[in-house]
Structures are given as C-alpha cells and as structure tokens.
Amino acid sequence: MAEAEEVKTMKILVTGFEPFGGETRNPSAEVVEHLPDTIAGAEIVKLILPTVRYEAPQRVAEALERYRPDVVLSIGQAGGRTAVSVERVAVNLDDYRIPDNAGNQPQEEPVVPGGPDAYLTNLPVKAMAEAIRAAGVPAEVSLSAGTFVCNHVLYSVRHYLERHFPGIRNGFLHIPYLPEQVLDKPGQPSMPLELSRRAVEAALTAIAGGNAAMPAGATGG
C-alpha cells in the first residue's frame, strides 16, 4: 500500500500598518492583531509594519526569509473609501500627499528604479471580493492602491518575490476608517472593526480555499 502523501499546511503572512498622518489608530493593525492563528486550515503569521517608505518592505523581506509563507496579504487603511477594496494593481510610483512616519515625501519617484510600470496581483481578487460580500461586508475590486506606502509595499514585495521567491503570491486589501476616526471628519465613511476583521477573514478563507490565481506577470516596461 502506498504511503499517504504529506499534506503541507498553507502559511499566510498577513501584515498591517502602524498609525500615520496624525492618527492614533490604524484599523489594519487592529484587524491583524485580532485575527486567529488559523483560518480555513491555513497558518496565519501576523506582522505590523512601520508606515515608512523603505523600512516597511524590508520588514516584509525579513519575514519572508524567516517564515517562507505561501502567500503575503497586506492590509492598509484607506480613508474615504466606503467598502473593502481588493487591490488588483501596484504601480511603480511614489507620490506622497503627506509624509510617511519618517518624514519621507517623495514626489513622482519610482518605487523601484528601472522596475516594470506595474504589477498585477496574482491572488484571486474577484473570488476574494465575492467572499467578503458573502460575509455581509461591502467589497469591491480596486484598480488603484494609491501612491503612498500601501502601494509601495504591494509593489516592492511583488518585485522582491519575482526575484527571490517566485512561487509566493501576494496581494493587498484596503479597509475604511474606524468609526472613532471620523468623529472629527464630517461626511467621511467608516466601518466597524468587527466588519473589517470579518472581511479579512473571508478574503483569507478564499485564498486558503484553493481559488485559482491570476497568471503572474508585470505590465509595462
């Protein structure tokens, strides 16, 4: 009788960001901290990143070397958005409206000089958005991760993976402000922490459930 084939447990590195822009809270960090250690059979490794241009992707690179995950899913705050955004594209552009937490404020500079104009994420973005909506949380597929540290991390991590760990996939979710963050921001939308956490768990379940990924690849030159 043949020996049973060993089933490898999927490992997903999930990252959030520290508060920035004068805020005292960042829902992405709080969601990551509240995630269980296992989701849909996948091991969840949690990491909070500094909201700093080059330091954030360096922390991810260190975690990649240490944990060797199958997937990296980064979470970030996107004030003004009304739904959870599953990002499809990372662009090779740093153009910061405000300084990061180290005072960096690049204008019209590349994330990686000489890198591709953009990368399409290789996670199942539509399946992730559908799973989030099925969990009762508004969600959309987004074509812009902005030009701040969130996009910088999405692009930099993918660029690093293409060169060092091409079998590892990565993607990004943007979540709205917390209700407490908009008390002094009339008209700004928000989402309770529990809903954002539910959305992230649903997206991770979709990833761990073996949904087919989009073909890997870059666009532009």
Language-model segments: residues:
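N-terminal catalytic or cofactor-binding beta/alpha core of small enzyme domains
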Residues: A2-A145, R158-G167, Q188-G221
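An accessory alpha-helical subdomain
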Residues: H174-E180
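Short acidic, glycine/proline-rich loop/turn micro-motifs
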Residues: L183-P186
